[in-house]
Amino acid sequence: MKHGQDARAATAGKGSCKNLVRHLRRIVAVAGFLLVVLHIRADSAVLARALEQEGQHSLAALEYRRAALAATNAADAARWHWLAAHAYAAGHEWKLAGHMLDLVEETGLSGLDVPLVWLRAEQTLAERDWPAADFYFDSLVRRAEGAEWQAYAQRGRSIARLRRGDVAGARGGLESAPLEAVERYAAGRDRRPWVGGLLGLVPGLGYFYSGEIGNGVRSLLLNSLFIWGLVETAQDDQWAVFSVLAFAEFTWYSGSIYGGIDAAHRYNRRRLDAAVDALRDVERPRAVYDTLPVLTLRFEF
């Protein structure tokens, strides 16, 4: 008799969990944000969540990995590994985050498609793997729903393409302010390093070419000072001092040439970084865990 009551209670509990999940999904359909039911008991993640809130992301990730080892099936282990990857990503430990995502991908768990692609896109962008970042952000554009997700994914894809030098592709899907940022970048002109080096033959001009007025003036003054010193010491037959000044002048003069080359590279980097910063000016998804009988992950902007 008691066994029958326990069985009915367990069946009722499972039914209530299923009803809760269906109810949450209906809410999500109205609210428009992504929600993932992880089917993990919330009390199993209490310590890890507390560590994350304290900013101890590495320790939190270890707790999630410990839970993955104790999981009774591959699907649950994959969910714990995704949580570990998210914790590592929050601590900017991208290599470890990537390893955890590899373990998730091995299971082929479909319920984590969008969260998995999102973290992959973040990881590859942080690791400056521009082709891979382009691929994952493009996948996110195709899979994620909602205006906020689309805006985030499209901008991320544009950043990856700009970094790759694909300015035409970076325009894809953009509107208003982000599109204007790409158009401004496309309308501008990079400085050519070889031109900067050639102009550097005249002290300071290589810097002026790339807009580094302060460095240009400094180079011009110092080279002029050394040349004046060379003339004065030669007229006074002070050849020992002349030799020291000649070495210093050779160093500063060659520095003017190489400085012109470096200044051109810096100019191009600043111009690209300005366009990327404008594209980054968008709300990023934030993973929020709801404390329910089953751990639920939703993303807010």
Question: Language model features by range: what are they?
Answer:
Residues 189-266:
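Hydrophobic alpha-helical membrane-anchor/signal-helix detector
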Residues 7-9, 15-16, 28:
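Short, low-complexity intrinsically disordered segments enriched in A/P/G/S/L with frequent Arg
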Residues 76-79, 115, 149-152:
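Start-of-helix register in tetratricopeptide repeats
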Residues 20-28:
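Bacterial N-terminal signal peptides that target proteins for export
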Residues 80-83, 119, 156:
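Canonical tetratricopeptide repeat
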Residues 33-41:
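Hydrophobic h-region of N-terminal signal peptides that target proteins for export
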Residues 52-96:
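N-terminal, post-signal-peptide region of Sec/Tat-exported proteins
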